[in-house]
Amino acid sequence: MRKPRILFCSEATFLNTGYATYTREILNYLHSTGKYEIAEMASYGERHDKNAKNIPWKFYGVVPDDSCSQEEKQQYNENPTSQFGGLIFESVCLDFLPDIVCDIRDFWMLDFAERSPFRKCFKWCIMPTVDARPQARQWVATYQSADACLTYSEWAGDVLKQQSGDKINYIGISPPSAHGAYQPIIDKEALRASYGINPNAKIIGTVMRNQRRKLYPDLFQAFRLLLDSVEDNSDYYLYCHTSYPDLGWDIPELLQQYQLSSKVYFTYICAQTGRPFPSLFKGALTQSPYTGQYGASLSSVKTGVEYEDLSKIMNLFDLYVQYANCEGFGLPQVEAAACGIPIMATDYSAMESVVRNLRGTPLTPKALYKELETGCFRAVPDNHLAAQKFKEFFEQPISIRKKQGFEARQAFLEHYQWDKSGKAWEKYFDSIEISENFDNWRVPARIKLPHPKPEQLPNNTTTQQLARWLILEVLGEPERINSYFESRLIRDLTYKNYLSTTGGMYFNESSAAFDGRQTRHPFDFNIAYDQMVYICTRRNTWEETRIKRMKEIFKD
């Protein structure tokens, strides 16, 4: 009996991004079982990437290399969503013939699989990033169309179940874990002394990129409120492992505004040795203590630190805080807990689940506001409450604080382990019956010629009638009746305009959220007809290619 074929769509597993790390760990677990044939379709990996030579499963790089035609390179560069794999997905499918396709990314990174002409040939198991509520109707409709849906957190699962009316086939959580380098360091005083930090300091730390949703202005204000509320604040420090300059907050301006220049540590990276060192803010570039040369910069995505070094940095903290207006997960909370550091986090989005699982302290937001771009709620933090919780934490005896750190570590071991997360995927894969002869890929071709466009529409034709005719007679996909696709088509025909998209495809308006650009364009029956013809023709072409490929493989 053949093994089930699993295709994971994500970022190249030789990278150190969040998606890449998660995929690498899950695929390593699945590969270790020996039960599956595995392949990855790798964003940001080249077709014949040398970094993939030691990967023990099949590798399909998304980025065209020198072996590709100029036309393919041009197609890739012209469409921003090509980086996620949409341009090569059908070709990969015809080469690998997956039984199950998986994806763990944001909506606009994964929805191409739902729209694929081959969707009926494979099971689709997804774990989308759910970082706020409510989720857009189009997103929920897509997740509902999947054969199975996992989430990063319990909170996200509750959101999807509630919004879909329990119509999503939700099968549980499969959260990420921390790298094995994240371990408690018992002698915290010696560690601090080695970095030139007061061994008796009281340090609140965070590891967050300098982004809009990471609430550095509020965190700085909350810390200022803490300093003003204690009798002697000389030993209190905030440690921010973040980037500057970046597209986010003006760090030096915030330090000046809240008079914190001597109270906030940052991580700098020596340009010559790559070694990190903590320092008060000294600008975007400063002198390295290792070489004496100028040019050390703050940590960033491009100049990051090794897991072992970040573990040491986290072990400098007495308390870890995740101060964001939303999170799809917030992995640094788990990494801090793995180091035995107590956790506090905004009590909203995935942080609701994570902070409780880690036996930390939820920080109730003051309010939620609805974001214009996404329609999702974001948290407004209560900085006075946060300052009070910080103060209460440090008023406890050291023995109690150490006990809380031990409990955080135990909670990490209980809830966030790679083998436990891998088993969630494994359980679903093992529930699927596969065809020994790849019958799922040998189904009859679905080919329909679009109905010719009428020279003139009948009088009093409603937009509902037009939409239905376009779907049934031009597109030829009756399953889209009574779907989000139909309701959106009716809406846009009625309003006579539509939202532009990064993908250039009418039917995916939400992909514009990928880069924040949303503009409206005219829309009428003629444009709608042309779009339906395009989708229909693309489906027909790939279906003909599939049938030809099956004949080559199986000699039918």
Predicted regions and their residues:
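Donor nucleotide-sugar binding/catalytic pocket of nucleotide-sugar-dependent glycosyltransferases
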Residues: 145-186, 265-266
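Nucleotide-activated donor-binding/catalytic signature segment of Leloir-type glycosyltransferases, i.e.
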Residues: 248-312
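Extended catalytic core of nucleotide-activated donor transferases of GT-like folds
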Residues: 47-148, 154-155, 494, 499, ...
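A short helix/loop element that forms part of the nucleotide-sugar donor recognition site in Leloir-type
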Residues: 182-197
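Aromatic "clamp/platform" in nucleotide-sugar-dependent glycosyltransferases that forms part
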Residues: 325
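A short, well-ordered alpha-helix in the C-terminal region of glycosyltransferases
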Residues: 392, 400-415
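Conserved donor-binding/catalytic core segment of Leloir-type glycosyltransferases
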Residues: 8, 198-214, 220-223, 238-240
